[in-house]
């Protein structure tokens, strides 16, 4: 993953040097997970415990025109859930499992603005948008030892996830953009929660839940970005 990150940094640095219409900034918010442990609320920032369900990251965006932009984003998140939390199904409460995990995610995607969003205009700009792409993420491998309620780490792994983002952004000042977005990620893992560890661990572990669907993680938050690069030049013929 380190080599991929370096290559992407070189690519976007080159893109920035020879072009314009760039944004760079930060993303902060809450995270929640959807899987085989705890409640199944789809969007629930901070999920009862801010210390284990938060996300922060950096974002780079290249605006191709008023409707389309490319994005690269790196996030670090903590996720967790418990069968003892409110709104959990009764059969899960009787089981009493809980876990914590961490995610390092690199995302590449394309944004589509529903309205024209002119980054050069001095007037207020705003638009809803959607985004999708692909993410590479690293997470802790977890398992539940037989008869133990808390998941324990036994390694780490790298996998893919497929994000769908909806958001709303505003440009209140010439060089700053604020966006509110919800980013739902369908992961290629069924073990973010420790419910389905590797074959070697299953003999000495409690495993449970459905293998028909993978785990999801959701980031909900705010981005603050700064516009940089040369403005359009309207030259006389």
Regions found by a protein language model. Give the residues of each.
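Extracellular loop and loop/strand-boundary signature of outer-membrane beta-barrel proteins
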Residues: 41-46, 92-99, 148-154, 207-210
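Residues on the lipid-exposed face of transmembrane beta-strands in outer-membrane beta-barrel proteins
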Residues: 26, 30, 58-62, 108-112, ...
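Bacterial Sec-dependent N-terminal signal peptides
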Residues: 1-27, 228, 235-237
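Residues that define the transmembrane beta-barrel architecture of outer-membrane proteins
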Residues: 20, 50-54, 102-106, 126, ...
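Repeated loop/turn-to-beta-strand initiation elements of outer-membrane beta-barrel proteins
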Residues: 22, 67-70, 118, 174-178, ...
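Short glycine/proline- and aromatic-enriched beta-strand/turn motifs that initiate or cap beta-hairpins
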Residues: 19-61, 219-232
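Gram-negative (and chloroplast) outer-membrane scaffold detector with strong preference
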Residues: 62, 66-144, 228
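Predominantly the C-terminal beta-signal and adjacent terminal strand-loop region
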Residues: 171-237
């Amino acid at each position: 993953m380190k080599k991929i990150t370096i290559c992407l940094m070189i690519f976007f640095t080159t893109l920035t040097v020879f072009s314009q219409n760039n944004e760079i900034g930060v993303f902060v918010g809450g995270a929640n997970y959807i899987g085989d442990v705890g409640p199944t609320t789809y969007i629930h920032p901070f999920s009862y415990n801010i210390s284990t369900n938060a996300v922060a990251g950096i974002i780079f965006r290249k605006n191709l025109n008023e409707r389309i932009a490319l994005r690269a984003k790196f996030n670090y998140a903590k996720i967790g859930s418990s069968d003892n939390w409110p709104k959990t199904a009764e059969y899960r409460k009787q089981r009493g499992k809980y876990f914590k995990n961490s995610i390092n995610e690199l995302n590449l995607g394309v944004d589509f603005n529903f309205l024209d969003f002119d980054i050069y205009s001095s007037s207020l700009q705003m638009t809803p948008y959607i985004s999708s792409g692909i993410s590479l993420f690293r997470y802790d491998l977890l398992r539940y030892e037989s008869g133990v309620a808390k998941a324990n780490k036994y390694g780490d792994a790298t996998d893919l996830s497929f994000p769908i983002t909806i958001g709303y952004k505003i440009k209140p000042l010439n060089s700053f953009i604020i966006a509110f977005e919800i980013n739902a990620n369908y992961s290629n893992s069924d073990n973010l929660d420790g419910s389905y560890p590797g074959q070697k661990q299953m003999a000495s572990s409690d495993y449970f839940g459905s293998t028909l669907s993978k785990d999801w993680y959701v980031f909900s938050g705010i981005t603050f970005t700064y516009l940089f690069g040369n403005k359009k030049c309207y030259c006389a013929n």
